[in-house]
Amino acid sequence: MVDSFSIYKTALLLSMLATSNAQQVGTYTAETHPSLTWQTCSGSGSCTTTSGSVVIDANWRWVHEVGGYTNCYSGNTWDSSICSTDTTCASECALEGATYESTYGVTTSGSSLRLNFVTTASQKNIGSRLYLLADDSTYETFKLFNREFTFDVDVSNLPCGLNGALYFVSMDADGGVSRFPTNKAGAKYGTGYCDSQCPRDLKFIDGQANIEGWEPSSTDVNAGTGNHGSCCPEMDIWEANSISSAFTAHPCDSVQQTMCTGDTCGGTYSDTTDRYSGTCDPDGCDFNPYRFGNTNFYGPGKTVDNSKPFTVVTQFITHDGTDTGTLTEIRRLYVQNGVVIGNGPSTYTAASGNSITESFCKAEKTLFGDTNVFETHGGLSAMGDALGDGMVLVLSLWDDHAADMLWLDSDYPTTSCASSPGVARGTCPTTTGNATYVEANYPNSYVTYSNIKFGTLNSTYSGTSSGGSSSSSTTLTTKASTSTTSSKTTTTTSKTSTTSSSSTNVAQLYGQCGGQGWTGPTTCASGTCTKQNDYYSQCL
């Protein structure tokens, strides 16, 4: 029989070994998360305010020697004199707390979050990536089936080459602590990032460092590429600047974050020939109105006038209108000056519509001549698996050292004729998105996200529908009141609205109901089927 003292010694030894190999936390700067309120809304039109907070990603943090001030990572290079392997760097290096405004240019006020592009303190910081927290050590997760996600945005100060991106990824809610016990930092310090590019520029993945095989970037003084990448599904709700915008679905083979190795990761960080070698779809099925020929829909002075703030609504429609149904459509609406604006439709007969559906994605890939990796990795069904499983909200501002953001706001690829379908994505010249140029010439750029709302369909916004006659317009009014529940203060908004039918034989409000080549429903559950052009009619 083993005596209790022997058991104690063994447990103590194992505990010491685990700690010695763990991803560490610094003690010099207290981690205080900036507060950010957001709302959950129901079909009755009532919205409850939640007092949340945001945390900056671990990749932006000071990484230093445990118990000292020597940098483990400086510029875009690891200090191999401190550690030289993924496991030893995890035990010898610590992630430090953040000073959000002075170091990273991140400020919050109520429901508003502002991200500055370039912030100069002791070092120059470029951009940022933050996550919404449920509590100090857990990311907020959203299950988006049969729901909508809404926010206000100001992109008027984002020129060519910048991307104010708000999106969802399938990160672990605790930042990876449960699955990878060597990760002692967790969500509190912004660990566990992943996306559909399987990024290899992360300093830590799965509780270990990424020093092995690390190659400093030749163009980015702050970044490099390691042997490992971090993969997971990604739903880009919003990627935009003052010129162009897009929303994109990126499915993966697994709904859970996974680590990959080398060029088998695929995506942006692998050789061009290996772009599609990974377990995720790096291209996705995207909708950029400009790319689909609708060049007057989004931009300064256009239908959605981005010289001033506006509201973005994204709806996730299931086949039977239930939370457990199959994802069939990802729909976009805008609200500006009290008017609800349906997404600008494609002008191409071969790929008609204004939302992401399985048939639209297939038609898009065929029309543009793109490799249909979306279908290879499960298409809208696989994207639905991730959305139903729960995803973490990311709010970011970044520039692009790999492709100069041309894929968003210019002609891309640059070797193709700009008049070919799908090549022109915006009006930016192909010479303007260079990251070094943007950082030097537009350091004062910023994006503001505010009034985040999540709820049942048609519960998070109000306004008068655009287009069509007055008989097809539905006026939505709001009336605010306050109430206190438990220890939280909640704001309840009452709203009269028209609720979409869940029938599969009719088009939903703001959905497509006709046009050349259209084979879907032609009757509206709400509103009137209104012709926008020969290829697109919409329920308004």
Curated annotation (Swiss-Prot):
Glycosylated residues (UniProt): 434, 458
GO biological process, one term: cellulose catabolic process
Position of the signal peptide: 1-22
Record carries keyword Hydrolase: yes
One Pfam family linked to the record: Glyco_hydro_7
Molecular-function GO terms, alphabetical: cellulose 1,4-beta-cellobiosidase activity; cellulose binding
Chain segments carrying region Ser/Thr-rich linker: 460-505
Active site: 234, 239
Stretches the record annotates as Disordered: 464-502
Catalyses which reaction(s): Hydrolysis of (1->4)-beta-D-glucosidic linkages in cellulose and cellotetraose, releasing cellobiose from the non-reducing ends of the chains
Function: The biological conversion of cellulose to glucose generally requires three types of hydrolytic enzymes: (1) Endoglucanases which cut internal beta-1,4-glucosidic bonds; (2) Exocellobiohydrolases that cut the disaccharide cellobiose from the non-reducing end of the cellulose polymer chain; (3) Beta-1,4-glucosidases which hydrolyze the cellobiose and other short cello-oligosaccharides to glucose.
Protein name in the entry: 1,4-beta-D-glucan cellobiohydrolase B
